């Protein structure tokens, strides 16, 4: 079945390119051995599409050059195909070159536009945590809103709510999690709500920005297959996946040999031999072995490693039992079951160990809350601050490090730090229970080493 899919894919791709491809001329730069592709805009485009290309070649040449180097530029997919919208679209506007015509465009291109040519990929994406769930945690969660606007946006210090200064911290979150796009009177985005990450919500009701992984305007499959594509969001103390990967044996091999690997193979054909070790995409998305390519990154996941307490995934976050089996199929591409079983056992038992610390922390938290011995501000209360540190920083390092073969992250930066934090939690708990009051001076330094 997989062979049939591959054959049909190759034939359809070949036919599509032969019918509508733009002509590209290869020129060699003397001495530098650099190749440049000069697109001749005289075949496969409507007059309107040509006008867009020629105008933007002058106004935004970097965008056009990037597009020319991508596969869309060589398959007659132009600005016109992706940016033109209906006149009654809430995002419809006209640039100076279009005024007086019936053509309306938008700088915003959502996954629904991509879905016209890539319906399967978009359908899978919309079922993943990269879609609606990612947006909710930033834009629909009361605690996150308080953190972004009242605390980080200095509303608590007198900054006017809703002012540019007040809302600017949101930009860093929406770069990955996505924004709720707001429009001005000309239907152009305002209030720093665009561009946004993979879970951006658009005024026409559509969701998702494929360009987060396939950066516009080259939209490269090779880029999305490299760990750097994931590492721009999955990094830092609260989700250090790229740091874990780089320190793992997989990351070591990518660092040493990655430039020699083939990242351009067609979907369903990208297999071991094109690479010597997996990138993020190989394990979580690629059609390796008996697996089919997927844009639903939940499908091969077992645990909710982001949460305060780790449980098997269920419901809209995926099927953890099925995910475990699917991920093991990916591992079979390079490893024996003996090797993989050890890795999965280390992951699972590290998670069980973390949960022991979290459960005891939750018990102490419950008793302190019942006795009114927790501060009202979680950012300044010593116990609440350490509790967040335990799960969001040290706890995630331990769990994710164990899941991705990052030994130091799992142990020294993870479990060892959990032990130290837990001892401080116990000390604060014991003081408050014994004295029936909150300590006058917090034992925790805000903004300490995380």
Q: Where do the PLM segments sit?
A:
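Positively charged n-region of N-terminal signal peptides that target proteins for export
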Residues: 1-6
């Amino acid at each position: 079945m997989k062979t049939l899919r591959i054959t049909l894919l190759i034939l359809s791709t070949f036919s599509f390119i032969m019918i509508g491809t733009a002509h590209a001329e290869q020129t060699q730069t003397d001495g530098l051995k650099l190749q440049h592709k000069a697109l001749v805009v005289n075949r496969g485009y409507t007059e309107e599409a040509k006008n867009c290309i020629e105008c933007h070649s002058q106004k935004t040449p970097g965008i056009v050059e990037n597009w020319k180097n991508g596969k869309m530029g060589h398959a007659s997919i132009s600005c016109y195909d992706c940016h033109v919208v209906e006149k009654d679209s809430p995002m419809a506007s006209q640039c100076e070159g279009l005024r007086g015509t019936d053509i309306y465009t938008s700088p915003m291109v959502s996954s629904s536009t991509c879905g016209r040519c890539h319906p399967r990929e978009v359908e899978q994406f919309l079922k993943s945590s990269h879609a609606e769930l990612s947006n909710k945690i930033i834009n629909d969660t009361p605690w996150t809103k308080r953190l972004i606007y009242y605390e980080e946006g200095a509303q608590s210090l007198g900054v006017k709510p809703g002012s540019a200064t007040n809302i600017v911290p949101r930009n860093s979150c929406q770069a990955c999690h996505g924004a709720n796009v707001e429009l001005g009177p000309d239907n152009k985005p305002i209030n720093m709500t665009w561009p946004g990450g993979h879970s951006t919500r658009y005024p026409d009701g559509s969701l998702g920005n494929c360009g987060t992984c396939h950066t516009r305007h080259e939209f490269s499959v090779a880029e999305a297959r490299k760990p750097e594509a994931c590492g721009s969001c999955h990094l830092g103390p609260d989700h250090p996946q790229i740091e874990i990967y780089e320190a793992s044996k997989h990351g070591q091999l990518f660092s040493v040999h990655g430039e020699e690997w083939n990242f351009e193979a067609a979907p369903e054909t990208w297999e071991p031999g094109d690479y010597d070790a997996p990138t993020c995409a190989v394990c979580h998305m690629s059609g390796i072995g008996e697996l089919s390519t997927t844009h639903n990154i939940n499908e091969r996941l077992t645990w909710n490693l982001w949460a305060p307490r780790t449980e098997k995934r269920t419901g809209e976050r995926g099927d953890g039992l099925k995910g475990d089996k699917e991920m093991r199929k990916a591992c079979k591409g390079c490893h024996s079951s003996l090797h993989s079983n050890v890795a999965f056992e280390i992951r699972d038992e590290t998670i069980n160990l973390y949960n022991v610390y979290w459960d005891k922390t939750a018990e102490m938290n419950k008793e302190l809350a019942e006795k009114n011995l927790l501060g009202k501000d979680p950012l300044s209360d010593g116990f609440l601050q350490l509790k967040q540190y335990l799960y969001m920083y040290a706890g995630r390092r331990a769990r994710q490090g164990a899941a991705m073969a990052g030994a130091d992250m799992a142990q020294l930066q993870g479990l060892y730090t959990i032990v130290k934090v837990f001892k401080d939690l116990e000390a604060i708990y014991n003081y408050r229970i014994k004295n029936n009051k909150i300590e006058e001076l917090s034992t925790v330094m805000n903004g300490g080493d995380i």
